[in-house]
Amino acid sequence: MRIIRYPSREEWSNIVKRPQLDVSLLNAIVDEVLTDIRRNGDSAVKAYEAKFDHVELQSLAVTDEEIRAAEGMISKELYDALVLAHQNISTFHETQRFEGSKIQTQPGVTCWQKSVPIEKVGLYIPGGTAPLFSTVLMLATPAKIAGCKEIILCTPPDRHGNVHPAILVAAKVAGVSRIFKAGGVQAIGAMAYGTESIPKVYKIFGPGNQYVMAAKQQVSLHDCAIDMPAGPSEVCVIADATSNPEFVAADLLSQAEHGTDSQVILITTSEEMLKRVEEEVNLQLELLPRKDIASKALSNSKMILVSTLDEAMQLSNTYAPEHLIIATQNYESLADKVVNAGSVFLGQYACESAGDYASGTNHTLPTHGYALAYSGVNLDSYHRKITFQHLTPEGIRSIGRAVEVMAENEKLDAHKNAMTVRIKALS
């Protein structure tokens, strides 16, 4: 990890830069696959599964028999953990239900909002080196609570055509409607356009590699909404002299092991803490099975020494991390100053892993600085809000002339006339 001591404000813009993700170079490949999926449906999906996932599939759909079999293939301990996590995620997201109210903006003018679930949503769960069954819970649970009628899940199978059993069990626990064996760009295209087997959805959620990111961005231009732009995983830890260096190092490594393009940042006011965390990172790194991945991520990462905790907080807000851990003695006062972050973890015992799995908050969060403008996945992500307004004759008299004047000054005569004919009818 690169160590930076007492950087000036002028240096901050360079410090907060992430490794650049240039998906433009992938767009030609992604576009070719998406076009093929749009034209050829299931046959194209199966062909790309054979090419990229090295599996020959007769059918894309996961059967009920496969799901039942999966339940006997995971330990009771894991099943109980999935159920507990699902309960907590449900409890947290249930509190996010929208309760709109009717408001009279002027006499005779009543306005309100209605929250309506997106009818069909698609969830993408990547394959790779670890089965992300936790992401199944994070995406499917709020979709079910929101009232989405159809929850489709796509995930790549292994070379034997099997989906990891924990993913199947998590999908059943969370209420997924149907599961399909498809990964990568072909899965995104199938959900965006629809195939003979895989239904077209209206919004796609879920993480993935750069090809998946590029595919989501492309389909979002014309065919299907997406949850948010995405980048590599990241964490920022703010520490002071009272922090536990073993805990801090463990938190940094928990994100570094995600992928070689992950980034972890330590901001501290203590030179001694910086040194002790550096030592702990090196010690714990040697014990990790994913040491090679974490080591490469650490090469993109930084330890930053600053003068005050206020400065640390300002630097963090400039960075806008996906995950922010405030492991300081006065974490409560610093928490009030957070304005840019995906999810925040307060105190010595709130490890980021808790939010990743079982505290109840959602772990699908904006990365790569998008926390400046985006929220993480929440219940509203699965809803649309439709506005209503009702005008009585009194309402026409209240706002009619203002509407006429504004329309006239925008030179939209038909707009003005739509109000004028009503005013005349009341004369």
Predicted features along the sequence, with ranges:
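Conserved small-residue-rich beta-alpha loop and adjacent elements
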Residues: 103-169
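Short acidic-hydrophobic, aromatic-tinged amphipathic segments that line or gate anion-handling sites
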Residues: 1-7, 178-183, 303-308
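Flexible, glycine/charged-enriched surface loops at secondary-structure junctions
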Residues: 98-103, 225, 262-267, 287-297, ...
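Conserved NAD(P)+-binding/catalytic subdomain of aldehyde/semialdehyde dehydrogenases
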Residues: 175-263
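C-terminal core of ALDH-fold dehydrogenases
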Residues: 318-427
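A glycine- and small/hydrophobic-rich beta-loop-beta segment
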Residues: 258, 266-341
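N-terminal Rossmann-like NAD(P)+-binding subdomain of aldehyde/semialdehyde dehydrogenases
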Residues: 1-119
